[in-house]
């Protein structure tokens, strides 16, 4: 079975469910982690869960396919959408579906959606302009869903890290810009307890792509996890590790659905393009 096919994605989810993992959205995680009573703490320690996070960087129609697989298995996930103008293939999906139609379809399947923000990059590092841009597009996505979580888009070729928006401050109030003032309850890179939650991402079209990732990595923890042997390259290796009980109890898995396809031509194209991107990112990381 080909890696990064929809078939092996289903097999990955089946392996997790067979081992007793609960598959949850990022909002589910945040809401549970906010509860601090003793019963909740004990349950959280014992419960096995995987946060399913999808970054919709391109080909949003692919995200609808993974969302349908998850729905058929009775699970929920979170889909973070970039604004349509910068999403490759963002204006049209399968059977001519428009970008808004794809978003609505994923919401209808019971999944969470959020804003995959890159406002610092799009606004050339102008913090004040980026804050206004962020608020505008947050409201855009709230047309389709009551967005409560957001996630930074890495934009590896940009010199600006969009998480730096939260280091900027409002000249009128003298306070830092704060997404929580807008009803946002969580951002995966900023509001996840990575001392408790192990992070896996398919960045680079593999599961150890953090080595060439510019921003989709967890500094301070990545090296520690690697020393513990929590390092797998292919989805086949990851599934084997799950079956052997080697995966930690609490995990966040991030995928980029444009990489997952059963279409042979699209599969090979993605493989070649991603290999080229990895070379470029490797040069950027140094």
What are these model-predicted stretches?
Residues 112, 116:
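Beta-strand-loop-alpha-helix segment that lines the small-molecule cofactor/substrate pocket
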Residues 1-53, 57-97, 104, 108-109, ...:
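Terminal accessory/targeting
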């Amino acid at each position: 079975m080909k890696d990064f096919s929809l078939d092996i994605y289903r097999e990955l989810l089946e392996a997790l469910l067979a081992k007793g993992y609960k598959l949850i959205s990022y909002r589910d995680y945040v809401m549970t982690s906010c509860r601090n009573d003793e019963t909740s703490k004990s349950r959280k320690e014992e419960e096995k869960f995987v946060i399913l996070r999808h970054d919709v960087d391109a080909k949003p129609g692919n995200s609808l396919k993974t969302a349908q697989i998850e729905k058929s298995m009775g699970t929920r996930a979170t889909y973070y959408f970039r604004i349509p103008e910068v999403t490759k293939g963002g204006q049209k999906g399968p059977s001519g579906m428009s970008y808004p139609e794809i978003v609505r379809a994923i919401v209808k399947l019971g999944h969470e959606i959020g804003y995959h923000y890159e406002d610092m990059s799009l606004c050339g590092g102008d913090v004040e302009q980026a804050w206004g841009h962020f608020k505008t597009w947050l409201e855009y996505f709230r047309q389709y869903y009551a967005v409560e979580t957001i996630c930074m888009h890495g934009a590896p070729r940009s010199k600006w890290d969009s998480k730096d928006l939260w280091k900027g401050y409002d000249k009128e109030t003298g306070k830092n810009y704060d997404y929580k003032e807008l009803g946002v309850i969580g951002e995966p890179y900023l509001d996840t307890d990575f001392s408790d939650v192990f992070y896996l991402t398919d960045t680079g079209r593999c599961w150890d792509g953090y080595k060439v990732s510019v921003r989709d990595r967890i500094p301070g923890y990545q090296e520690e996890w690697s020393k513990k042997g929590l390092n797998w390259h292919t989805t086949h290796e990851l599934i084997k590790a799950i079956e052997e009980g080697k995966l930690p109890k609490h995990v966040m898995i991030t995928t980029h659905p444009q990489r997952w396809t059963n279409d042979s031509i699209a599969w090979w194209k993605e493989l070649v393009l991603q290999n080229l991107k990895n070379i470029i990112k490797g040069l950027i990381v140094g």
